[in-house]
Swiss-Prot record:
To T.pallidum TP_0126. This is Uncharacterized protein TP_0733. SUPFAM superfamilies: OMPA-like (SSF56925).
């Protein structure tokens, strides 16, 4: 009888202490309100270090001026008529390029173009400029604004004469990135061409204005 009585005493004690059991079971555990729970914020970067791109486009250009030369060369590599007043008429071609981004704004790349211009003598001047291009790109939403400089070698040909030349250019572009992989847009540029000749009086300098439209593949 005493054992039964003690058993009922234990049951009664447990029932009396049952409201306190959750408090003891949760001792040392702090519940965090939903408003204070940690949140992970992922910042979207339109351009990241290590991004690369390939670009291809068509280019059209016209001559702004030509200077230099003594007029003794009847067919200069600049495509003139030899009197210092020759002119490159309209022309164009296409280009291929590559860029690698070291930061979210700065990239370094290269470009090769294949261009042909008609001259005042009804002939054709061919040019293959190869440049190294440091570029700083601004990103505004889906728009990309690359500002670039370029220096390099110009492989040029006019009639039977082939001669190397130098090239320097400055350009500004506007592209719209309609998917993560592709963007489309154009570039306007000023290009300075110069001959490499045996004597300074045979060198000519040509200034060109060009515009191109193209697409870029980002990876």
């Amino acid at each position: 009888m005493s054992r039964t009585f003690r058993a009922w005493q234990c049951v009664g004690a447990l029932c009396a202490l049952s409201p306190l059991l959750p408090a003891y079971s949760s001792e040392g555990v702090r519940e965090v309100p939903p408003s204070q729970s940690p949140q992970v914020v992922v910042a979207y970067e339109p351009i990241r270090p290590g991004d690369q791109l390939l670009k291809i486009g068509i280019v059209a250009g016209c001559q702004l001026y030509i200077a230099g030369g003594n007029g003794t060369n009847g067919s200069s590599s600049s495509g003139t008529n030899g009197n210092g007043n020759g002119k490159l008429l309209g022309g164009g071609g296409f280009h291929l390029g590559y860029e690698y981004f070291f930061t979210k704004n700065f990239s370094l790349g290269g470009q090769v173009s294949f261009e042909c211009y008609r001259t005042t003598g009804s002939n054709y001047y061919f040019s293959v400029p190869i440049t190294v291009n440091p570029t700083y790109t601004f990103a505004v939403g889906r728009w990309r604004i690359p500002l670039s400089l370029g220096v390099g070698l110009n492989i040029q040909s006019y009639l039977s004469k082939k001669a190397p030349g130098l090239i320097a250019e400055a350009s500004a572009g506007l592209y719209y990135q309609y998917t993560p992989d592709w963007s489309i847009g154009g570039i306007v540029a000023y290009t300075q061409l110069g001959d490499i000749a045996s004597s300074p009086d045979k060198c000519r300098a040509v200034g060109l204005a060009t515009i191109d439209f193209g697409v870029r593949y980002h990876f």
